[in-house]
């Protein structure tokens, strides 16, 4: 979905007040009359977020609710074409269940990297749970391919450093990752070309991803944070590493009937009946030499469809989320950054199936002050999950 129209909104404790693209001037009047007029505008303009035409829903909301609460949020509907979605039931793909398929996947990744594949080079071991893991170590410089039960990866030294030993690695799970979403294009290729390269690679590996991706430009701001293994990199200096490691970090989201799986950790394994929640984000590094790093995510395969039902509009969820945030805002400034329609995988141990439930995921953050010998603030990231059919709060974290 491309960028559509925007709306600038103000929120009161009672309702949403919106003006489309330009502020509305209100004459000087007493507080009650002014408030009534603002509420009248809200009832009229809120229809933009409650329309039956999905394509007319704005994809970004900006507002200052009060001194402590800000909404500057992307509204992600992904491939939604109507206000109806079906739940469904799935199994998780096991990439190492078949030795032959694991070898084929390794061969694909090595061919794409320009590395020579030989069956004798593929090694295998079992993890603590007895599951097989297949891999090929090309060198001791983080050049390798791995196939695990729930995912697979291809890594080069340069890609590994960019995504796993850099400032971006420390930032990307928090709101600071937006510092790298500058839109700056690097000399070796445009953002659009690099995004397409990442999508094409995923599809060659058998993963269907959404047309919507997130791209972050890693340039001089992306410093290497770990040089403990410097002995592995002969004749390298931090300055040389910085200059040669300009790249794009691209996040891909697996597509299920037009909607991604839940992309980030909800922070509570009980919600999914799983001991650990695995993000559905595929991470890719693209640099001057092409794909430098690719890590897939758990993939769910359809077993049976559930029942199609109408889902709530974004406006309903935004109102609920703002009220929830207002109840917590006295502890620090808060920002709602994203409202996204996603599938939540809930594992049923009896059937051994995942129930893929459509949910509205609201990603938000709060400035938290830590007191001690030296006081400091940190930006804490949270997620609230709502049943897309009923609006029931499944989790606030």
Named regions from a protein language model:
Residues 21-273:
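Preferential activation on post-signal-peptide N-terminal prodomains/segments
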Residues 2-26:
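Sec-dependent N-terminal signal peptides of Gram-positive bacterial secreted proteins and lipoproteins
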Residues 197-283, 287-371:
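Segments that shape or occlude catalytic/ligand-binding pockets
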Residues 3-6, 37, 388:
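Short linear motifs in intrinsically disordered/low-complexity regions
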Residues 190, 313-314, 387:
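Helix N-cap and loop-to-helix transition residues
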Residues 145-169, 261-294, 370-397:
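A short, surface-exposed beta-strand/turn
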């Amino acid at each position: 979905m491309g960028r559509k129209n925007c709306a600038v909104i103000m929120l009161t404790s009672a309702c949403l007040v919106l003006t489309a693209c330009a502020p509305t001037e209100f004459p000087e009047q007493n507080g009650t009359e002014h408030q009534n007029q603002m509420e009248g505008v809200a009832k009229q303009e809120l229809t933009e977020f409650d329309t039956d035409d999905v394509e007319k829903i704005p994809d970004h909301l900006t507002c200052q609710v009060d001194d402590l609460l800000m909404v500057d949020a992307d509204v992600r509907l992904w491939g939604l074409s109507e206000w109806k979605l079906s739940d469904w039931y799935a199994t998780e793909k096991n990439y190492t269940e078949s030795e032959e398929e694991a070898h084929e996947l390794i061969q694909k990744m090595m061919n794409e990297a320009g590395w020579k594949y030989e069956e004798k080079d593929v090694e295998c071991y079992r993890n603590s749970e007895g599951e097989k893991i297949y891999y090929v170590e090309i060198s001791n410089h983080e050049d390798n391919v791995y196939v695990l039960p729930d995912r697979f990866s291809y890594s080069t030294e340069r890609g590994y450093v960019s995504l796993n030993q850099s400032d971006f690695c420390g930032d990307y799970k928090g709101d600071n990752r937006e510092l790298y979403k500058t839109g700056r294009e690097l000399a070796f290729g445009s953002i659009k070309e690099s995004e397409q390269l990442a999508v094409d690679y995923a599809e060659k590996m058998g993963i269907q991803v959404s047309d919507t991706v997130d791209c972050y430009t890693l340039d001089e701001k992306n410093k290497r944070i770990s040089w403990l293994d410097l002995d592995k990199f002969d004749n390298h200096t931090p300055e040389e590493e910085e200059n040669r490691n300009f790249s794009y970090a691209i996040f891909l989201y697996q597509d299920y009937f037009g909607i991604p799986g839940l992309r980030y950790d909800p922070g509570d394994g009980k919600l999914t009946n799983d001991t650990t929640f695995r993000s559905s984000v595929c991470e890719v590094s693209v640099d001057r030499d092409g794909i430098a790093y690719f890590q897939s995510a758990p993939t769910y395969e359809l077993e049976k469809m559930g029942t199609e039902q109408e889902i709530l509009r974004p406006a309903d969820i935004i109102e609920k989320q703002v009220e929830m945030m207002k109840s917590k805002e006295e502890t620090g400034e808060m920002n709602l950054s994203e409202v996204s329609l996603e599938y939540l995988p809930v594992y049923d141990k009896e059937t051994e199936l995942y129930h893929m439930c459509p949910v509205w995921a609201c990603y938000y953050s709060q400035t938290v002050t830590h007191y001690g010998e030296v006081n400091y603030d940190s930006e804490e990231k949270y997620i609230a999950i709502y049943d897309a059919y009923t609006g029931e709060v499944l989790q606030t974290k």
